[in-house]
A protein has these predicted regions:
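AMP-binding/adenylate-forming catalytic domain of the ANL superfamily
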Residues: 214-238, 255-260
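Active-site glycine-centered loops adjacent to acidic/histidine catalytic or metal-binding residues
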Residues: 16, 40, 65, 127, ...
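AMP-binding/adenylate-forming catalytic core of the ANL superfamily
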Residues: 73, 79, 95, 99-100, ...
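Beta-strand->loop->alpha-helix junctions that form or flank phosphate-binding loops
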Residues: 36-43, 63-67, 175-178
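Phosphopantetheine-dependent thiolation modules in NRPS/PKS and related acyl-activating systems
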Residues: 190, 238-260
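Adenylate-forming AMP-binding core of the ANL superfamily, especially NRPS adenylation
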Residues: 18, 50-51, 57-109, 116-117
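Gly/Ser/Thr-rich phosphate-binding loop
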Residues: 1-58, 72, 82
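Glycine-centered tight turns that cap/initiate beta-strands
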Residues: 8, 32, 70, 168-171, ...
């Protein structure tokens, strides 16, 4: 960041991937400016945000912010019933009270996908979130990204945020791998910072795993580590966890470990 003159920039915002606390804190420390995080989809305008100039709405780093006035949102369980604050559900938008501004009306030549997205008077985003007592919404993960292991539901973003606090981790993606005993086990695919790339990978695995054990619950700790040069991403920069899952699908766990 020291290479760039940011003194004339007044405000900064981000979207696409949830921002971890470390990035927010470093940015604030070096620029003196907050990052205003928001959330939307290709199918919509801004759905939630840490909106600027709202005196009663301070930035909560890592949150998607509060709902935009343009959308009436609900957080629903699998039976399309609202969940209480603090409980995880799918972020949905009311469409039973008139079609909201900036929201798609359907997917081109895909009746099935349109029917799936618009169901029960709601547009279903496919994103799992929870709302805190101040009305801020927090991203948990795409519905198909959530890892189910030994009866626990694990948010990839939560584990990624822990791992990225380790100085060796530049970025990472956490996914579930099929396991006969647990249903799924947690896997971390990691890009190391340049200073650590030549270190022994087994030693790095032990070091990062130890760090994870010290900072999160045992059931969330990755059991498999893969070190890569880069993560698969979309054109807009979002991590394609689905690509990692597809690569590992149907493989024996020991075979996956040997591959790395």
């Amino acid at each position: 960041m020291s290479k760039y003159d940011l003194s004339k920039c007044q405000r900064f915002s981000t979207a696409g991937e949830a921002l971890n606390d470390e990035v927010y804190d470093k940015w604030l420390e070096q620029t003196g400016k907050r990052i205003y995080e928001g959330y939307g989809q290709s199918e919509s305008a801004v759905i939630c945000g840490n909106f600027m100039n709202f005196a009663d709405a301070p930035v909560k780093p890592g949150s998607m912010g509060r709902p935009s006035p343009a959308y009436n949102v609900e957080i629903l369980n699998p039976n399309d019933k609202p969940v209480p604050n603090g409980e995880v559900g799918e972020l949905c938008i009311h469409v039973d009270q008139g079609h909201p501004f900036g929201l798609l009306t359907g997917y081109h030549k895909d009746i099935s996908l349109t029917a799936e997205a618009f169901d029960g008077g709601f547009y279903h985003t496919g994103d799992n979130v929870y709302r805190d007592d101040d009305g801020y919404i927090w991203f948990v993960g795409r519905k198909d990204d959530i890892i189910k292991s030994s009866g626990y539901r694990i948010s990839p973003f939560e584990v990624e945020s822990i791992l990225q606090k380790h100085p060796a981790v530049m970025e990472c993606a956490v996914t579930g791998v099929e396991d006969a005993k647990r249903g799924q086990i947690v896997k971390a695919t990691i890009v190391l910072v340049p200073a650590y790339k030549d270190k022994d990978k087994k030693e790095m695995e032990v070091e990062i795993s130890t760090f994870a054990k010290e900072n999160t619950a045992m059931y969330k700790i990755p059991r498999i580590y893969e070190f890569v040069e880069e993560l698969p991403k979309t054109i807009s920069g979002k991590i394609r966890r689905v690509e990692i899952r597809e690569k590992d699908k149907g493989k024996d766990i020991e075979k996956i470990k040997q591959d790395f």
